[in-house]
Each structure stands twice: as C-alpha cells, then as structure tokens.
Amino acid sequence: MNQRLSALVNGGFLSENEAHQLMHDMMSGSLTDAEVAASLSILAHRGETAEEMTGFVRAMRQKAEPAERSLDVVDTCGTGGDGLSTFNISTAAAIVASAAGAKIAKHGNRSVSSKSGSADVLECLGIHIQSTPEETRRQIQEKNMGFLFAPMYHSSMKQVAAVRKQLGFRTVFNLLGPLCHPMQAKKQIIGVYAKEKAKLMAEALAPLEPEHVLFVCGEDGLDELTITANSYVIELKKGDMTEYTLNPEDFGLAKGYLSDIQVQSPEESAKLIQNILNHQTEGAPLHITALNAGAALYVAGKSESLMAGTLKALETIKNGAAKEQLARLKQKTKEEEIYA
C-alpha cells in the first residue's frame, strides 16, 4: 500500500510534504484506482487540513501546463456545487470588470453539476474558449480578458477523472480547482459553497503568499457574493486575514430572490447575461453582477473599496462600456479563425 495512503487509513494526518507527494502520485498515475478512491474517500469523510491542502495545491500547480505568470491578473471563479442553478454570475462579473479596466484571466470548465459552466456560457455568447496560452496572453493584454479552459492546463487530472465520476460525491478536487490557477494569479475572487470550506481554503492559500484574494460565500448557499441574503467574506491581503459579513443593502442594492437569477441551460444563462450587459435587465440579476464585478475591481486595485467597485461596475453597465466589451471579446483573431 502507498505509504501516504497507509497513514490515512490508520487515522493519521499528512504533513504538507506528504500531501504534496500523495497528490503528485495521483497526478502521475502511479496509484491504482482503488488507492485513489480510498484516499479521496478518507479525506472526504474526516475533512482535509489546511496543511494537507497547501501540499495538494503545490503539487497540482507543479503538474499544470506552463502559462504566462508575469501578468497582473484577477480570476473570478468558484468551487461550484451549490446546486442552486443560477446564471454564470462570476463570468458576467468578469466581463464587466474587464470593461472597467481590470485584467481578467478567467479559469473555468464545462458544467459538472450545474446547469451551465463558464465554458458553456462563453461558447453560447460567441466567445472562443480553447485558446493557446500565447493567444490567451494576447487577449488579456489587448482586450483585458482571456479564458483559461481548465482541461488544457490540467491534463494530469485525467488520471483521477474516472474515479471521481464513479465516487459521485464531492472530493478535495472541488476545492483545489480555484486554488490552482494556471497563471498562479495573485488576485482572485473565489466563491465557496460552504463557510467552513472557505476558511479551510483561505488557510491553505495563505502560505503561498497571494496578494489580494476574497473568499466569498452567501448565507443562501451561493458560491458568490449574493443578493438574496448576507455574504460571508474572508479577505487575504498581503499576509493579513480578515473576516466580515457583507449586506447588499449597505451598498444600496435591494435584496432579491433566488428565482430571479436561476436558469435552466447555458443558452438561458447567456441570454440573461446579454440583457444585463446591454442594460436591459434591472433588479437582482443586474445587482448581483455589479456586486461581484465590484469585488473584482477592488481586488484588481481599480477601486478603493467594495462599495466604490460596485458603483463603478454599475456605471460601466449603464454607460454601455460592458456591452462594448462583450462585442470586443466576440471578435475572433486570425489564429482563432484558423482553428475554428
């Protein structure tokens, strides 16, 4: 039996280095499916420690395909798994934030359990998702936003894909994805489906010295800053960790209903996003997009506070800049036309 797995079976905890080696073994295909399943099951049952998570993240980052790491970018992504079937809020927020001057490197995938993954809705919006690393870098520099399609950068995940599908329950990989940005983005908005997992992820990321990251979790269970209730926030900024609760009404945003932001398909999500960016939709969809875009602008250093960022995001939508940015993102480059 694998030495690290043996420690888990016997009720032990792994050091950061041991966790790093276990994840390296998983990603390298040197464990049997049974050993992978046992490791994931034990961790899911007893819960991962922050030290173990840090080791896992280091290993996954090392196994990721090379990507540009010199750009000052922000990622807006989440763990998913909230089961609430909302439209792609973080994707809409990314477009608005990029229209307002933030450089966004959106890391995402197709849907696993939701109605619409970020890759799915971007395709419906007419935005190319399978760009090369070099093309993505150019998109970020020239258009303020590029998409990093997760399977293109985390090919070693195929070693555990079958086991994860067979297990059918959440595993540590649901938490690791947002922490393993291919560009190793130092600025992020990370949505988390549960408050205790947000704390775990923050404690795991802190030793890796991020510049400015917000972990957000709605009291309604949404893995975003929500508009239907208060949101729990953990802020990591240059080594300091603070926790607070955010009430959308403090930002002048009336609380809405989940039913106002739920969709049944990527096509429906894309239509709602277009309406938001065209400023043809008011209420909860507009407000939740602005709130999350405002957070991205705050983390990017384009606004001095969450409040200022939210107001800037609203103005970006109202003055037509967000609509123009969507049109710009749809324009194909020569390279994209060749591979289309």
UniProtKB/Swiss-Prot annotation:
Signal peptide: none annotated. Mg(2+) 1 binds at residues 90, 224. Its cofactor is Mg(2+). Belongs to the anthranilate phosphoribosyltransferase family. Mg(2+) 2 binds at residues 223-224. GO terms for biological process: L-tryptophan biosynthetic process. Keywords: Amino-acid biosynthesis, Aromatic amino acid biosynthesis, Glycosyltransferase, Magnesium, Metal-binding, Transferase, Tryptophan biosynthesis. This is Anthranilate phosphoribosyltransferase. 5-phospho-alpha-D-ribose 1-diphosphate binds at residues 78, 81-82, 86, 88-91, 106-114, 118. NCBIfam families: trpD. Anthranilate 1 binds at residues 78, 109. GO terms for cellular component: cytosol. Homodimer. Pathway: Amino-acid biosynthesis; L-tryptophan biosynthesis; L-tryptophan from chorismate: step 2/5.
